[in-house]
Amino acid sequence: MLMTKPPVPQLNLTVVREAAERAARAIPPLWPLESSVAVNPFLGQTGEPLAMAAARLRRVAGAAVTMPRTWYAERIASGELSDVDLAAAIDAAPPTTRPLTIAELKRAAQIEIAPPQALPTVAELASAVSGFDWTGFVAERISAWASGYFDRGQALWAAPKGPNAYAAWRLTATHDLTPEIFGLTGFAADVAAAPESADAALIRAVEQLGLSEAASESYFHRLLISLGGWAQLARYRLWQAELSGSTDTAVTDLIAIRAVWDSTLLRKYQPQIAAEWTDAINGYVQPLQPTEDDHINAILQDAVERAAQRKLQTVLAASAQPKPDDRPALQMAFCIDVRSEPFRRALESLDPRIRTLGFGGFFGLPIAHRRFASDVVEARLPVLLPPRVTTSCSGHTHAHEANDRAKRVAARAKRAWGRFKLAAISSFAFVESMGPVYVAKLLSDGLRSGTRRTNADPAPQFDPPLALGARVDTAEAVLRAMSLTGPFAPLVLIAGHGASVVNNPHASALHCGACGGFPGDVNARLLAGLLNDPQVRTALIGRDIAIPADTLFVGALHDTTTDAVTLYDADHPSPAHASALAQTRDWLATAGALTRSERALRLPRAATGGAIARRARDWAEVRPEWALAGCRAFIAAPRPHTSGRDLQGQAFLHDYDWRKDTDFSVLELILTAPVVVASWISLQYYGSTVAPETFGAGNKLLHNVTGGIGVVEGNGGLLRAGLPWQSVHDGERLVHQPLRLSVLIEAPHEAISTILDRYPEVRALFDNRWLHLFALDDDGRMNWRYVGDGGWEHADNPPTNQRVASFE
């Protein structure tokens, strides 16, 4: 019997367009490889609690948002997850959704549930009845086009661009006979007959699919998920455009493109799949409703996080370190990155006169930077912010200018040689003829025990120079935000961080997220120069910040892969500080050795700290460092309340003294910038662990770079976003425990609430428990827990213990 087409509803273009816009904003952005940063994969779901997000992502992605039940059951059996934790999680859940007893929750943890299943697309239904993988075929054809369209210089033949993504795809698809060869007769003609505008094409496809306006948003979200990283890359373009007050349609164009594929497949397979497709449409229309299992999973996840918070309470309840009143011999400011914590702990253990502090690694300088001998502008600041000043490393002296020209010529020659190596007519011949020439270099690179040392760029400078008033305002704002207003040591290091790895497409993800995926050396050197400026220092005295004449600021770079620290003391030569610098280098070397020994215990095949540097140069090493795996806490408090405590490299540490923050402007900055950045990092690790197929980048061993923008697994397919599996798993067990971040701030909880009320999007992270929030008392103890909707409750604390506990 011939099935009739689904009824064609009357559609409102504005309503459908708005549904596409909402679906687009439910997708997280994906930054290109050159500046990749961690992104919260649940960015579009932070306005709803975990159970509701579970229902949504099950429908559109077939993805879990929590671990398998066995994971929780194992922790209950081991005692790690106690009855106290389970009871507290039950009490915190909405009354209508929680089990009645702890025993019921434990029984539920023993029952494994079916994996989530997404609603089907037409391509999936066509695959099921035809025996041909239309789902994979559509993904492959769109990927083949997208890799050329979004290319950033890797492709040797440029793809047609067109005025927008839809127009460019349409131009390509009308000449692509591959679908016809594989049986989709008339595809090119269908595309040619489609409207020229993406909006009109989308309406046409939706009508042909028989979708209602009510079904559109979920269906559009489903289509974007089916495109993997390509949809996220398009979302990145919209993100960047909106930062500059513009817009971009690539992500909604992708919805139209993917819908055209489905409508064409429905025309071919409608007699076989009409009933199933009608059922799917009805599923897309249904209001989202979490299941009982969704609520139980959310409660179990909350319980595990409460268990971790209980351990952290014990660590912080240990007696605080006394705050020395004498002048320190050395102060060193680090990025808040969790990898800084072990190094800071090791460095402070060497001498009581050493003080460290934590601050966002861009050090309050929102710069667009041009490196020496380069015209490429790098946004070295959090991706949440637009650059406000420009800087460069060229033009200091005639010698620098000559060197700049020479390096530019060398760089152009290197690029030309590289393109020749990749060219279709020469690539194989190149390997045959030139391979032996590279033997010595390959052996040298592979056998070198340490990291490659490169000559530093000249000291960066503001370009154009900032007026004195702007320099003073910037210096004051940064020092107050760092809670660094005195006393000052004779030597103050400002240390950014970066990573030294080879053969790693995701190398920028190991650099500083607060610097937009670049190393933090430029920002550190800029701030050191600003604070060494005599005019700035004189003006700061009038603002109650007196920097002693014998204090020298020096920029530095902490290599998180090797724990070596580079000092840029040549930027500001000071013979008077030669002895202090020599002593500091000794301290840094010793602290680096201690930190490497600690890290070696966690890294596979790194029996000693000495193996760490060799790993950085190993082409085959998929785990040169663990990066931010294990991150679980963000603490903003005076350093004495965290110093001496073993936080296992799992806490972001931000120095903050609310008593100096009279208007709570620094508290506002912390809650709206570094806390949000840390949440993106934490939730990227969380998503890549609980649902690696959806939110992870797959297997590093299979990665190939495409378009200079991202990676695919193998020879093609969808762009992969998120973290590779090797970043969260050591081959035998998880090294990242998927826990939502606990944010601890030493400040009056009333002040925290006032700021959250001004920023609904930040408050939503806490109201919906994507983050946990605690206010610390004046002794650094977890005193208040935020319970949502502006409410707080007293947090139970263990008795004060003189012994310093471990976070493990």
From Swiss-Prot:
Topologically, how does it sit relative to the membrane? Peripheral membrane protein
Which cofactor does the UniProt annotation name? Answer: Zn(2+)
InterPro entries in alphabetical order:
DabA
GO molecular function terms noted in the UniProt entry: zinc ion binding
Q: Which GO terms describe its cellular component?
A: plasma membrane
Chain positions recorded as Zn(2+) binding sites = C335, D337, H497, C512
Keywords annotated in UniProt = Cell inner membrane, Cell membrane, Membrane, Metal-binding, Transport, Zinc
A Pfam family found in this protein is DabA
**Which cellular compartments is it found in?**
Cell inner membrane
Signal peptide coordinates? none
Q: How does it assemble?
A: Forms a complex with DabB.
Q: Which family does it belong to?
A: Belongs to the inorganic carbon transporter (TC 9.A.2) DabA family.
Free-text function comment from the UniProt entry: Part of an energy-coupled inorganic carbon pump.
PANTHER family, from UniProt? Answer: INORGANIC CARBON TRANSPORTER SUBUNIT DABA-RELATED, UPF0753 PROTEIN AQ_863
The cross-references to HAMAP family, in alphabetical order and at most eight, read: DabA
Tell me what this protein is called: Probable inorganic carbon transporter subunit DabA
**What organism is recorded for this protein?**
Rhodopseudomonas palustris (strain ATCC BAA-98 / CGA009)
Q: Which gene encodes it?
A: dabA
